[in-house]
Each structure stands twice: as C-alpha cells, then as structure tokens.
Amino acid sequence: MATKASNLVVFLLSLLLLFLLISFQVGVADATRNKRQGQEQRVDYDYPRPPTAPIYLPPSKSRKGKGP
C-alpha cells in the first residue's frame, strides 16, 4: 500500500511540475508577443501623421459690416 501511495504522490507532483512548466512557457510567449507589439507601436510614434487638410468654410452671407 505504501508503494501505491508513493507512486500516486510522485505522479501528482509530476503533473504539478508539468503544469507549472507549461504555464511558465505560455507566460513567456505572451510577454514576448506583448513586447513585440509595444515596439511596433513605438515605431508609429516615431513618425507623426501628416496634418489633415483644413476644413473649408465659405464666406458668410450676412450683411453685418456692409452698410445699409
């Protein structure tokens, strides 16, 4: 009975270790992906967008300032 219990403990510890290693690898992969995305976003800030064209407003047709 003792060998079965020790085998079960070893098996559970192995599963726990495997889970920790996989979660660590996923965390590293996410961190490198986020790091790459951050670098791509910084490149966008190095080159500012050109200014947009001004909005055309036609001259006012009011009679203000034109006399009677």
UniProtKB/Swiss-Prot annotation:
Signal sequence residues: 1-31
Biological processes annotated in GO: defense response to bacterium; response to bacterium; response to cold; response to ethylene; response to jasmonic acid; response to salicylic acid; response to salt stress; response to water deprivation
Top-level taxon of the source organism: Eukaryota
Induction field: Induced by cold, drought and salt stress, but repressed by pathogenic bacteria Pseudomonas syringae pv. tomato (Pst) DC3000, jasmonate (MeJA), ethylene (ET) and salicylic acid (SA), mainly in shoots.
GO molecular function: LRR domain binding; receptor serine/threonine kinase binding
Organism: Arabidopsis thaliana (Mouse-ear cress)
Function in brief: Brassicaceae-specific phytocytokine (plant endogenous peptide released into the apoplast) perceived by MIK2 in a BAK1/SERK3 and SERK4 coreceptors-dependent manner, that modulates various physiological and antimicrobial processes including growth prevention and reactive oxygen species (ROS) response regulation. Promotes the expression of immune-related marker genes (e.g. WRKY30, WRKY33 and CYP81F2) in a MIK2-dependent manner. Inhibits root growth and regulates root meristems. Prevents general growth and development. Exhibits antibacterial effects against Pseudomonas syringae pv.
Protein family: Belongs to the serine rich endogenous peptide (SCOOP) phytocytokine family.
Subunit structure comment from the entry: Interacts with MIK2 (via extracellular leucine-rich repeat domain); this interaction triggers the formation of complex between MIK2 and the BAK1/SERK3 and SERK4 coreceptors, and subsequent BAK1 activation by phosphorylation.
GN (gene name): PROSCOOP13
Chain intervals for the UniProt region annotation (Disordered): 33-68
Entry protein name: Serine rich endogenous peptide 13
Effect of a null allele: Slightly increased growth and fresh weight.
Biased composition (Pro residues): 48-57
Intracellular or extracellular location(s): Cell membrane; Secreted, Extracellular space, Apoplast
Biased composition (Basic and acidic residues): 37-47
